[in-house]
């Protein structure tokens, strides 16, 4: 009996011990898993392509502004710090997640075709020099009405408050930032700048301004003050718009005050696609979300992970499949026509998200990369490869904004309005690459049409794990390649957010050739060549891809701005 009693007591004690151990593990493990790295923020973050603009966005959040408020303030700043990329003379696309409703919306304020555009504009596509275009390529700017619509729907602070930091920046002795200086003093841009009206802004006599030179820009400061006080309508139906139109008319622009008054941003549903445990929300055509979704939908079927790419052959295999998916994607870019101007293709972009198409494409991908262009439906028409800016914001309540803005190629049309301080876009150049594969006919522009775009401001949400990735990029046709690889690196390969963005990328051009960023892994590069992947013979002068992202993982918030553009994120 004594032995049995002792056994019972031991079993009871063992059970109690196991129970306590389970309780301890249940309490300790979540805390361990939720521990944040030293570079994490705990509440909110902003990732713009410069530190000063990220900081301005952060301050707006700390003043109880909404993520949309912060994004707008950061974009206004970026139009000054990186005017070669974006500004009031361009267009913007917002993808916005409202944590209180769980709803995602897209605000599309991309530029449009003016009513009195040159009827023979597209005849100039073949000979167009994207870096020396001109007034005939100017689209109706949508930037400010895009801000106004986003602020009307989601703003919290007074409109004028969003402009004050940048007005102060201009009034207090603004100097040329290093990145702007690089663009101003790049050999392939200088001849165009020298012959343009931008001379009066960016030249000191016969020399272009250099880093830290004073950059007086009183006209833009005055414009921002007017817009802050009177609202966006002063540009679209007021005196500022009249001044802008008059300034650029003598440079060949056919933009009218009627074009400005007629512009309306579109509020639309995002494209939505399951990506493992995440849901990807991205902008529909004419933005590039359908192409980004298509690529990731194809790639997810191959189940790449950190383990599968651990060895050299695994890396080569993954990049081979990526290259092949990018080739098929380039062949689908014609689907990005504006569905409002071309209703016949309204549902074509949705086809790109279908699992049946993804499965079909996977079956077309084998171990070789030397198939004919027709295998991928490639047309050989090249898009622009630089320009644009992106801001990602995550607010304290979990709401998020991904916003991409552009004037198209560096310095846009290189047309300057001296009385408003606004640089104009050359967005109509993007109409040149919207003909179908196998056809040499490019449909004539439609007044009010928005040109196709590679912009992909995107938000990926994992409701179960409480994770969120807010991401987008710049770089023209490089955007989708760069954003795809950043997402793959982060979500599938387990990179830190900073490393996911910093990793050298590859890109597939319209001829199916692979272009490698400097410092791309040479072993992988050789492995791809062994599989028949052809390298582009004309290496681009510089890779201008730039990705900004914020990643929320439980209580941890990580933000990264691309060092390629000397960016730095900010948060708290």
From Swiss-Prot:
Annotated metabolic or biological route of this protein: Lipid metabolism; leukotriene D4 biosynthesis; Sulfur metabolism; glutathione metabolism
UniProt binding sites for L-glutamate: 110, 406, 427, 453-454
Cytoplasmic compartment segments: 1-6
EC number assigned by the record: 3.4.19.13, 2.3.2.2, 3.4.19.14
Domain of life: Eukaryota
A Gene Ontology cellular-component term: plasma membrane
Pfam family membership, one: G_glu_transpept
MF terms in GO: glutathione hydrolase activity; leukotriene C4 gamma-glutamyl transferase activity; leukotriene-C(4) hydrolase; peptidyltransferase activity
Reaction catalyzed: glutathione + H2O = L-cysteinylglycine + L-glutamate; an S-substituted glutathione + H2O = an S-substituted L-cysteinylglycine + L-glutamate; leukotriene C4 + H2O = leukotriene D4 + L-glutamate; S-[(2E,6E,10E)-geranylgeranyl]-L-glutathione + H2O = S-[(2E,6E,10E)-geranylgeranyl]-L-cysteinylglycine + L-glutamate
Extracellular compartment segments: 30-572
Transmembrane stretches, start-end: 7-29
UniProt-listed GO biological process terms: amino acid metabolic process; fatty acid metabolic process; glutathione biosynthetic process; glutathione catabolic process; inflammatory response; leukotriene D4 biosynthetic process; proteolysis; response to oxidative stress
Cellular location(s): Membrane
Tissue and organ expression note: Widely expressed, but at low level, except in the airway epithelial cells. Detected in brain, heart, kidney, liver, lung, spleen, testis and trachea.
Regulation of its function: Inhibited by serine-borate.
Membrane topology: Single-pass type II membrane protein
Glycan-bearing residues: 98, 185, 194, 204, 277, 303, 347, 377
Post-translational modification summary for this protein: Cleaved by autocatalysis into a large and a small subunit.
Similarity comment text for this entry: Belongs to the gamma-glutamyltransferase family.
Biological role: Cleaves the gamma-glutamyl bond of extracellular glutathione tripeptide (gamma-Glu-Cys-Gly) and certain glutathione conjugates. Hydrolyzes glutathione releasing L-Glu and Cys-Gly dipeptide which is further metabolized to maintain extracellular cysteine levels but also to provide cysteine necessary for intracellular glutathione synthesis. Among glutathione-S-conjugates metabolizes leukotriene C4 (LTC4) and S-geranylgeranyl-glutathione (GGG), but is inactive toward gamma-glutamyl leucine. Converts extracellular LTC4 to LTD4 during acute inflammatory response.
Protein name in UniProt: Glutathione hydrolase 5 proenzyme
Organism the protein comes from: Rattus norvegicus (Rat)
